[in-house]
Amino acid sequence: MKIVDVLCTPGLTGFYFDDQRAIKKGAGHDGFTYTGSTVTEGFTQVRQKGESISVLLVLEDGQVAHGDCAAVQYSGAGGRDPLFLAKDFIPVIEKEIAPKLIGREITNFKPMAEEFDKMTVNGNRLHTAIRYGITQAILDAVAKTRKVTMAEVIRDEYNPGAEINAVPVFAQSGDDRYDNVDKMIIKEADVLPHALINNVEEKLGLKGEKLLEYVKWLRDRIIKLRVREDYAPIFHIDVYGTIGAAFDVDIKAMADYIQTLAEAAKPFHLRIEGPMDVEDRQKQMEAMRDLRAELDGRGVDAELVADEWCNTVEDVKFFTDNKAGHMVQIKTPDLGGVNNIADAIMYCKANGMGAYCGGTCNETNRSAEVTTNIGMACGARQVLAKPGMGVDEGMMIVKNEMNRVLALVGRRK
């Protein structure tokens, strides 16, 4: 099966591009927007619409394979690739990539994806968002050629012989950490709520007292609203380094506090993402490693999730090799090609580390569907309900795709 044409269409994402540097410099709020001047190159507003590019590969039998290029909310910040605007990058795909795809015979996913993921133009690698979308489209093309799901393609190439099963779906609330939890309970999210605990004084509490109260509220709310006794979601709270900030990155003090949270969460299991941020990769690994060892030594029913300083496949391997946490977030679309997601999850699994197939609120329904297939095929511990920050939409997209894949795979057994 050959690719006979490549089309690119501009699109919207499930959220927004925010100029992180402008926000950190004190951009003001005005309703849902920000006031003040932009700082990061490419931004025309501090908050502007999130943009995507759909890549459509027309196959010689008339089928169309589809992947979406998308970037994170804080595109252009923190050493990332430039702000991802469709008008800037559609010409790159049409000029540099499409000619290499048109006329190509579709073979296996892995070698084709790796070729385009590693491709350079004028000595530079392609934008991560382009690598993300192109490799999604290639995966869909291979699946359409073989007349199977994308999950089966990934399973056969990366995880041969494995069963394709449902994976727990993780919903995140953003700042609306009370009303959105009610939505999650009604729809029975498997993992919840994220909660966006990114400020010590306002959200964690100077001694952690505010988050402790929230965990107690969360526990009681689930018990009150659940319609069946055996609905027992995992608590996954992202604290953005605030526990380390409140407790001076003291391992024993942080462990004491997390132990208190774990007790308050019972009968539910607790995960804490990003307990500290020590602003250095090596030191971050060591702090996560030592805190995990302390919690495990005490037998605390809590897991740590690595986030800060764990961005690339190499970072994932580094944290995994050193047992720096119990789980790592596999960050899409920062990894570029979706082949890297499969590689990262399989490495985690082979080395006793939990793999969370994550992502961003600022991607699309299509990229969410594709990465859900990959998470299922590789046996991730959880997948993110995405895109958007409304809970309902992301859960619908991810859960429905999962159920479709399970039905199609089951039919072929």
Curated annotation (Swiss-Prot):
Active site, per annotation: 331 (proton acceptor)
Sites marked Transition state stabilizer: 194
Family: Belongs to the methylaspartate ammonia-lyase family.
Regulation: Inhibited by calcium ions.
An annotated Gene Ontology molecular function: cobalamin binding
Job of this protein: Involved in the methylaspartate cycle. Catalyzes the formation of the alpha,beta-unsaturated bond by the reversible anti elimination of ammonia from L-threo-beta-methylaspartate (L-threo-(2S,3S)-3-methylaspartate) to give mesaconate. It can also use L-erythro-beta-methylaspartate (L-erythro-(2S,3R)-3-methylaspartate), L-aspartate, fumarate and ethylfumarate as substrates.
Keywords: Cobalamin, Cobalt, Lyase, Magnesium, Metal-binding
Protein known as: Methylaspartate ammonia-lyase
InterPro entries: Enolase-like_C_sf, Enolase-like_N, Me_Asp_am_lyase, MeAsp_NH4-lyase_C, MeAsp_NH4-lyase_N
Protein's organism: Clostridium tetanomorphum
Catalytic activity: (2S,3S)-3-methyl-L-aspartate = mesaconate + NH4(+)
Cofactor(s) required, per the database record: Mg(2+)
